[in-house]
Regions:
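Substrate/cofactor-recognition hotspot
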Residues: 314-556
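Conserved short loop/turn motifs at secondary-structure junctions
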Residues: 38-42, 70-78, 100-109, 132, ...
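Basic/polar N-terminal segments that are highly enriched at the extreme N-terminus
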Residues: 1-12
C-alpha cells in the first residue's frame, strides 16, 4: 500500500469514474445516471462509507442523475432496524437525499423466480454437501475444484428440492442452491458459487415468510438491474466479483447494470474493520459506537466534525484505482478549515492560576464586546465580563523565560485579550514553591478604542474568576499509536497498539457566554482549539469534546 502525504493527494481533475460517466452519456450508452449506496444494515457506518456516500451521491448530482439507498438485507441473523435508522441518519447528516429507499428483501420474490429460471436453463442445482465439503471441493488457485456428486441432478429434481427448501422442509445448512458454471475456472468465484442458503430466522422486514436467503453475489447485480442502476460503484476488493456480476445479468437477459471499482479509504492511526470495531465496543475499550475516538460517522459527528468538512475531505482524497494510506491530519485539516470560517469564539482556561489586578476598583465589573467570529467583523458579538481577579493559563507565565517569549513574565507586559494591558508586579507562591497568584497593575488608558493606542507583543486569554463557569473537557487523541495499522505483523494483536492517552478528562473555566451558545457546531476556545458540546451535557454540567487542535504543521 502506498502512503500518501499532503503533496501526494491529487489536485482536482476529472477522476476515472467521471470520465466513464461522461463517455457513457456522450455515446448514448445511458441517457441518465443512476447510482446507489447499498449498505448492509448490520452495523454503523464509518468514514470509509462516508467517502463512498459522497462519491455515489456526488456523481449522480453532478450529472443530473439520481441515487437510491438500498439496504442489502439478505442475512436476517445480523440485521436490525436499529442499523437501518442510524444509516439513514448518517446519510442525511452528510447532506444527501436519496431518490428511493429500497431493500434487497423487496426483490426476494423476483430473485426466487430468476433462481428457478437458472435451474430450468441447467445453470443451477441443489447441493447436499456440507459447508466444509463445498469449501474443500473448490480446490485452490493452483488446483482445480471437484464437481459435487449432486451437480448433475435433473432440472425436475432440482426444482422440487429448491421449492422444498423454500417451503421449510430442510434444516439450516442441509442444502444450498449453487450456480452451475465451471469447477476448474481460474477465478475461484466461478466455481459453482452459492446462490441460496437456508436460514430459519426472523427477518426484520419480511418476518418469517422466507427461510432461504440469496447470497450477496447473486442478489447484488440483480438488485442493481431491477433498479436500472447505470453505474454500480464498489470498492476495489469487489473487482474479482465483477465477471460473476456480469454472468448473472447475461444469463438472465436483464437490464445490464455495470460495476466499477475504486480504492477504499485507508487512514493512518485507524482501523475500520467491522469485526475489530465491534470488539472495541464489546470489550469497553471505547464507550460505544459513537465514542468520539471511533471512525464511525456517529463518532466523528459527536467529536464535532461537520458534514461540510467530511465532504471536503472526500473531495481532497479523490477517487483512485490504487490502495492509498491517507494521513489522518488531512481530515483534521478539513474540519479546521471549515470551523475557522464558521465557529464562534470563546475564552476557556484549562490550567488556571489566579491573576489579581491591584489597582482595579474593588467590586467593579466592566463588560467588553468581543466578536463571535473575527472572520465576520460585521457579525454578532458577545459580552465578556472583566473584573479585578481573573484566571490565566499557568503556561502563559514564566519567571525565567527564554528569548522571544512574549507572554507574561516578571515586570513584563501583555494585553488581556479584548481588554487592557497589564504589568506583572509580584509573584505569590505556596510553601512548596508553586505559584498561586500573580499580582499585576493595569493601564487604564490602554483600553481598545480609547485614548492613544499602545501595542505590546503578547496577548493572552483569561476568564473572570467571579463569572467563570466550570466545564468538563474531554481531550481526545488518536485511538492507536501505530500509523499503519494495516501493516502490523500477522498474528499480533492490534489492541497492543491502543493509545492509553487517547482520552484525558479534565476541566476548564469558561466565560459565561459559552454556555449560551446554540450554534450547533464546534466552537473555538481561543488560543486552544476547537471543541464540541457533548450530548452528555446537562444544565448542571457542560461537557465539551476536543475536535482538533487550533493549528497543525500539516498544510494542504
Amino acid at each position: 500500500m502506498e502512503e500518501v502525504n499532503k503533496e501526494a493527494v491529487e489536485t482536482r481533475n476529472l477522476n476515472f469514474l467521471e470520465e466513464i460517466i461522461e463517455a457513457d452519456l456522450a455515446s448514448g450508452k445511458c441517457e441518465s445516471v443512476m447510482t446507489r449506496f447499498p449498505p448492509e444494515p448490520n452495523g454503523y457506518l464509518h468514514i470509509g462509507h462516508a467517502k463512498s456516500i459522497c462519491i455515489n451521491f456526488g456523481l449522480a448530482k453532478k450529472y443530473g442523475g439520481k441515487t437510491n439507498l438500498r439496504f442489502d438485507d439478505t442475512n436476517p441473523v445480523k440485521e436490525d432496524t436499529e442499523y437501518v435508522d442510524s444509516i439513514k441518519e448518517d446519510i442525511k447528516w452528510l447532506g444527501f437525499e436519496w431518490e428511493n429507499e429500497r431493500y434487497a428483501s423487496d426483490y426476494f420474490d423476483q430473485l426466487y423466480e430468476w433462481a428457478e429460471e437458472l435451474i430450468r436453463k441447467g445453470l443451477a442445482y441443489v447441493d447436499d454437501q456440507t459447508q466444509e465439503e463445498i469449501r474443500a471441493g473448490r480446490g485452490t488457485v493452483q488446483v482445480p475444484g471437484t464437481e459435487s456428486p449432486y451437480r448433475n441432478r435433473s432440472v425436475e429434481e432440482n426444482l422440487q428440492l429448491f421449492r422444498e427448501m423454500k417451503a421449510g422442509k430442510y434444516a439450516d445448512g442441509e442444502k444450498v442452491l449453487r450456480a452451475k458454471i465451471d469447477m476448474a475456472h481460474p477465478n475461484m468465484l466461478f466455481r459453482d458459487p452459492l446462490l441460496y442458503r437456508i436460514i430459519h430466522a426472523h427477518h426484520h422486514r419480511t418476518g418469517d415468510k422466507w427461510c432461504i436467503y440469496p447470497m450477496y453475489d447473486y442478489a447484488h447485480g440483480q438488485s442493481d438491474s431491477i433498479e436500472n442502476i447505470t453505474h454500480s460503484i464498489c470498492t476495489l476488493e469487489f473487482d474479482v466479483h465483477r465477471p460473476l456480476y456480469d454472468w448473472f445479468i447475461e444469463k438472465l437477459g436483464i437490464f445490464p447494470s455495470h460495476q466499477y471499482e475504486f480504492a477504499r479509504l485507508n487512514l493512518t492511526y485507524t482501523v475500520m474493520s467491522k469485526r475489530k470495531l465491534l470488539e472495541l465496543v464489546k470489550n469497553n475499550f471505547v464507550s460505544g459506537w459513537d465514542d468520539p475516538r471511533m471512525p464511525t460517522i456517529c463518532g466523528i459527528r459527536r467529536r464535532g466534525y461537520t458534514p461540510e468538512s467530511m465532504r471536503m475531505f472526500a473531495e481532497k482524497v479523490g477517487v483512485a484505482k490504487r490502495e492509498q494510506l491517507i494521513d489522518l491530519q488531512l481530515m483534521e485539516w478539513c474540519v479546521r478549515q471549515d470551523l475557522n470560517e464558521r465557529s464562534n469564539r470563546y475564552m476557556v482556561v484549562q490550567d488556571p492560576v489566579k491573576l489579581t489586578i491591584t489597582n482595579w476598583e474593588p467590586g467593579k465589573v466592566e463588560w467588553f464586546d468581543a466578536p463571535l467570529n473575527p472572520a465576520d467583523p460585521e457579525g454578532p458579538s458577545r459580552k465578556v465580563p472583566f473584573t479585578g481577579e481573573v484566571y490565566i493559563e499557568r503556561n502563559d507565565f514564566m519567571e525565567e523565560p527564554p528569548k522571544k517569549y512574549f507572554r507574561l513574565k516578571p515586570d513584563g507586559e501583555v494585553r488581556l485579550k479584548y481588554t487592557y494591558i497589564i504589568k506583572c508586579q509580584e509573584v505569590v507562591k505556596d510553601a512548596e514553591g508553586n505559584i498561586v497568584e500573580i499580582k499585576c497593575t493595569y493601564d487604564p488608558t490602554s483600553k481598545p478604542g480609547a485614548g492613544e493606542w499602545r501595542s505590546v507583543k503578547g496577548t493572552i486569554h483569561w476568564v473572570s474568576t467571579e463569572h467563570a463557569k466550570e466545564v468538563e473537557l474531554r481531550l481526545y487523541d488518536k485511538l492507536f499509536t501505530e500509523a499503519q495499522m494495516g501493516q502490523i505483523p500477522e498474528g499480533e494483536d492490534y489492541k497492543n497498539y491502543l493509545n492509553p492517552e487517547s482520552l484525558v478528562i479534565g476541566k476548564g473555566y469558561a466565560e459565561p457566554a459559552l454556555l449560551e451558545d446554540n450554534s450547533g457546531i464546534a466552537v473555538q476556545f481561543e488560543r486552544v482549539g476547537y471543541f464540541f458540546k457533548d450530548p452528555d451535557s446537562t444544565p448542571e454540567k457542560f461537557v465539551y469534546n476536543k475536535t482538533t487542535a487550533l493549528k497543525d504543521s500539516f498544510k494542504f
